[in-house]
Amino acid sequence: MTQLTITRPDDWHVHLRDGEVLKDTVRDISRYNGRALIMPNTIPPVTDTEMALAYRERIMAEQPSEQFQPLMALYLTDNTTPDEIRKAKESGAVVAAKLYPAGATTNSDSGVTSAQKIYHVLEAMQEVGMLLLVHGEVTAHDVDIFDREKEFLDTVLAPIVNDFPNLKIVLEHITTADAATFVKNANENVAATITAHHLLYNRNHMLVGGIKPHFYCLPILKRNTHQLALIEAATSGSKKFFLGTDSAPHAKGAKESACGCAGSYTAHAAVELYAEVFDLEGKIENLEAFASHNGPDFYGMPRNADTITLVKEEWNVAETMPFGSDIVVPIRGGETIAWAVK
């Protein structure tokens, strides 16, 4: 197959940052997505409804494509209240709340120190029908960075799923076979997003032949056996897995340093990169469900009414892209991608 028309996709996990860079990140994410769920770990984090609505206004001020709708999320802290959850739900603009274990990833220092501290908040979320988004890693110093997702599943997420069976939960950017199996075996209220870079790459790509800082992200790339399990899950047609890029830009200098930031930028070509994976697996016919159907179905939203067309046509990716007054190195920068949006 050399051409494929699919329902317009959505991105259910993306970082746009804030300030002068919004003009560039909004341009890329709105190019063909109908909706994008905007992560709240900005500086300062989006911890209440007023902040979420103000952030949404700043995004919309960049005049994204007419079809584009940003969806907002709250950043959960130990001090989040049930009343704030109800207020967010009533706003109509905030569709989820995000659990960042404190210190697990970029700008997460204000996150939740213990899941038990927000159980009353999770109860309110279950009651009003607000989704819980989860960065699934523990932060204990004695847990190896490659094992943090598995440990989180066992010690944090499994109890939450058990204690809140009617709470819809999205395990974000899964990176292990363990996570894929957990989601498959969990009740129908548990789903997961999978990034393009975790499907395309494993830790060898990041570490062999020299450190490749633009592959460094959190959760970190795992061994190839986990990569293969993610590919199987994403391309399987299962309604439990859907597109969430976790596109997370940092300026080139912030990545290429002695203490580089975590995050890979894929918003410039997300659906094209996913198409490569599905095509290589001989499952290109399942791309539409993963990219365009499963996400809105799980969130209880209508699917987009229009379409985009992909063609199997190689194109060159710019080595760098504008990022406010700086530049960002995108995934595949200076290389080619096999599929293009027509």
UniProtKB/Swiss-Prot annotation:
Q: Which of this chain's residues are annotated to bind Zn(2+) 1?
A: H13, H15, K98, D246
Any one GO molecular-function label of the UniProt entry: dihydroorotase activity
| Residues carrying N6-carboxylysine | K98
GO biological process terms, alphabetically, are: 'de novo' pyrimidine nucleobase biosynthetic process; 'de novo' UMP biosynthetic process
Q: What is its EC number?
A: 3.5.2.3
Return the GO cellular component terms, semicolon-separated: cytosol
The protein's annotated pathway:
Pyrimidine metabolism; UMP biosynthesis via de novo pathway; (S)-dihydroorotate from bicarbonate: step 3/3
Give the PANTHER family listed for this entry: DIHYDROOROTASE
Q: What protein does this entry describe?
A: Dihydroorotase
